[in-house]
Amino acid sequence: MATEDVKLIGSWASVYVMRARIALHLKSISYEFLQETYGSKSELLLKSNPVHKKMPVLIHADKPVCESNIIVHYIDEAWNSSGPSILPSHPYDRAIARFWAAYIDDQWFISVRSILTAQGDEEKKAAIAQVEERTKLLEKAFNDCSQGKPFFNGDHIGYLDIALGSFLGWWRVVELDANHKFLDETKTPSLVKWAERFCDDPAVKPIMPEITKLAEFARKLFPKRQA
């Protein structure tokens, strides 16, 4: 990996931190991972992100960059000669990738998270149905974007792969909680194969959270799930 003054403030369990880590690994950038403890904020985090006071924060040459998707953009541009391009080269393809990345964050993930916070069986059933519907849209988006290739971005992991793939660990935790498979060979065959390829990629595999550890963390984060 390339040697530079790079630090990343975050947590092993955060999907947003995962995005930054995958991008750094794709670009073969060495970095110091400064782990935050959930429920507390370090002085460095507050100093580096005084507006939102949230992780992740990438610190490159003492300059902080905040927000996960912005960090991924920055990594792709700052190290454009290292590793494959993360963002598509064509402006239209970049626009499509950004559209679906926003959909994942603003709609799809909200539905997934609502399964963990649902009050009662009926609310959970409604949340599961909504996730099913929105995941089918992502199946179609994958087929349209990939054009028969292994990833949304084509032959290698790119921006949209990172945007969705960073959620895979938590997605499996939600499947366990809901006792329901969302990635299913009969309903989303393309996404099933994509998820396997994504998790096996050398840039992802070493940092993907272990599911039992993540599930235990989720029980602490969402205590009502134990009821």
Swiss-Prot record:
UniProt-listed SUPFAM superfamilies: GST C-terminal domain-like (SSF47616), Thioredoxin-like (SSF52833)
Domain GST N-terminal: 4-83
Cellular compartment(s): Cytoplasm, Cytosol
Coarse class of the protein's main subcellular location: cytoplasm
Binding residues for glutathione: 14-15, 40-41, 54-55, 67-68
The organism's place on the tree of life at top rank: Eukaryota
Record-listed E.C. numbers: 2.5.1.18
GO biological process, one term: toxin catabolic process
Recorded GO MF terms: glutathione transferase activity
InterPro entries, per database record: Glutathione-S-Trfase_C-like (IPR010987), Glutathione-S-Trfase_C_sf (IPR036282), Glutathione_S-Trfase_N (IPR004045), GST_C (IPR004046), GST_C_Tau (IPR045074), Omega/Tau-like (IPR045073), Thioredoxin-like_sf (IPR036249)
One GO term describing the cellular component: cytoplasm
Reaction catalysed by this enzyme: RX + glutathione = an S-substituted glutathione + a halide anion + H(+)
EC class of the enzyme, as a word: transferase
All residue ranges annotated as the GST C-terminal domain in the record: 90-221
Entry keyword annotation includes GTP-binding: no
Keywords carried by this UniProt record: Cytoplasm, Detoxification, Transferase
Function of the molecule: May be involved in the conjugation of reduced glutathione to a wide number of exogenous and endogenous hydrophobic electrophiles and have a detoxification role against certain herbicides.
Family of the protein in this entry: Belongs to the GST superfamily. Tau family.
Designated name of the protein: Glutathione S-transferase U18
Natural source organism: Arabidopsis thaliana (Mouse-ear cress)
